[in-house]
A protein has these predicted regions:
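A short acidic, Gly/Pro-enriched loop at the edge of an enzyme's catalytic core
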Residues: 134-146
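Residues lining the SAM
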Residues: 148-150, 178
């Protein structure tokens, strides 16, 4: 289904948009391991094409992520400690900075992406690690908010990583996940699993749902979904 949709988009859109969509699709191809994904992103960043391919006319995930945080933190944004998971080249960090957030760390497994993010001077600490079931070099209850925009997909962040997100977030803090809506059905890792685990964690008193919102044109013409949870 995802491959057919990608082919249809590529064939029916202008060459530049089709090329960008194709590059993004190759980062989410079925069967990719997390190591494959990290290597692809590093090469994409090194080519100088990543930020052009996923500019604001094509990819709005960072704007949606920053706005979701801005709606929750109306005051004293400079002191809100945030971890941008799957930070990439710093798109979300830049959008958060525009909203007045100043205490932002980033995490991404692709060093080529982080090399670009580092130059933007919107992050404090940058950590080159995969987000998985492995314990990160981050203490419990470190962040007021952890946020992901674009880090969910084939070979990307697994469901089990939700536990680690909760561990590093302070009680009362937020976990915000912004992703393509169709991945809930098209990505085997998430199909009949991700939202079930989210509900199980709520039933177990680990967090509580604040909102679940569908948004248009998250990535190219695809809808996005924003999950917002409060850690207990």
């Amino acid at each position: 289904m995802a491959e057919e949709k990608a082919l249809d988009f590529i064939q029916s859109n202008p060459t530049q948009d089709a090329s960008a969509y194709s590059a993004n699709y190759r980062a989410h191809k079925e069967g990719m391991t997390k190591e494959d994904v990290a290597e692809y992103y590093s090469k994409w960043a090194d080519s100088g094409k990543y930020e052009e391919d996923l500019g604001p006319d094509r990819y709005n995930g960072p704007k949606y992520g920053a706005e979701a945080l801005a709606q929750s933190y109306l005051d004293d944004r400079e002191s809100i400690k945030i971890l941008d998971i799957a930070a990439g080249t710093g798109f979300l960090g830049e959008e958060l900075h525009k909203k007045g957030f100043r205490t932002i760390d980033g995490l991404d497994p692709a060093e080529g992406m982080l090399a670009i993010a580092r130059k933007k001077n919107v992050y404090g600490r940058l950590v080159c690690e995969f987000m998985s079931d492995k314990r990160l070099p981050i203490e419990n209850d470190t962040y007021d908010c952890v946020v992901i925009a674009g880090g969910m997909g084939e070979g990307h962040i697994p469901c089990v990583a939700l536990h680690e997100m909760i561990r590093i977030t302070k009680p009362g803090g937020l976990v915000v996940i912004v992703m393509r809506e169709e991945y809930l059905d098209h990505v085997e890792e998430y199909k009949d699993r991700l939202e079930i685990l989210m509900q199980e964690l709520e039933d177990d008193g680990k967090w509580e749902s604040i909102s679940r919102v569908i948004v248009p044109k998250y990535s190219f013409d695809n809808n996005g979904i924003i999950f917002k949870y409060k850690v207990c």
